[in-house]
Amino acid sequence: MASNNFRLQYLKIENYKNIKCVEFDFSNKNGVTLLIGNNGCGKSNILEALSSIFAGLYQSRLHKPDFDYIIRYSINNNIVEISLSGSSYSISVNNKSFSKTEFSVRKDCLPKNVIACYSGESQRLWEKYYWPYYSNYISTIKKSVTIPELPMIYINRYNIEIALLTLFFYDFDTFEDIREFCANTLKIKHIQDITLHYNPKKIREWNDNAVLQMVKMLNDVDGVPVLSADKITLSLDELKSKLSYMGERELFKVLYAATMPKDDKVITSIELNLELNNGDLISCSDLSEGEKK
């Protein structure tokens, strides 16, 4: 059965590192899969293979998988099945065949993003599958009128502030599952205040895209030249009010764009003061490395 949301149904991988031939049937699962095994058995290789598959589907000029696979998933009421054998793709959407070129323009048949979060020390996943997309993204973002899409997103502990802000940007009365996750899993009751630090020099070098529009809205100014302060502190309610024109995905996208360019950051750092369930007040920097991961 097809659905609007992306749902992985079947995956077969052949001859990728120590994976000679493995099949997964996800069709009767609830959307969350846990892989359990000894060190060195290939768990991380499964994540790498999935990343390789979609990296090759988004832009083959940036990456080409070097193994055979079959993947089937549902998205936007479509059933998509893709197989790669050698260098030859076979693609069908609702049992209708498409060439790789034809499929590439079907924006409704690929997930908007593949997001990876890896807590290990190895940088292989990032460097091989996510860095090429990130590098391409960063090279254009500063002068772009609109924020470009980044299909392959790699999250690590340095994105913890963005991740927490995005979660608490949701309306907890509507999204009860997110409220319960923040309260029961993260043990965080509330974000007490948020401080954004800017780089005024870099701000003036950027095009007037969504990143600068956000900065202007937060500071209640009409133009960047009149921006005098290099930081602003707001409550969570103030942030939500000033950025009410944004959805949660847009907030994440804009904050990611503002904070990630190594040499061109508009927002150089984000400080969060958190109220825990037990009433303690801590800063985000007080979280241990394990908690951030």
Tell me what each language-model feature is.
Residues 2-48:
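Pre-Walker A-like glycine/lysine-rich segment at the N-terminus of P-loop NTPase domains
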Residues 2-4, 27, 155, 163-293:
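Extended helical coiled-coil dimerization/tether regions that scaffold
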Residues 5-7, 29-31, 40-41, 65-67, ...:
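Short, well-ordered loop/turn elements at secondary-structure boundaries
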Residues 16-18, 29-31, 40-41, 76-78, ...:
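Short, solvent-exposed loop/turn segments at secondary-structure junctions
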Residues 20, 44, 55, 80, ...:
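Short catalytic/ligand-binding loop motif for oxyanion handling, primarily in non-cytosolic enzymes
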Residues 29, 47-101, 109:
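Conserved P-loop NTP-binding catalytic core
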Residues 90-215:
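Electropositive, glycine-dotted interaction segments
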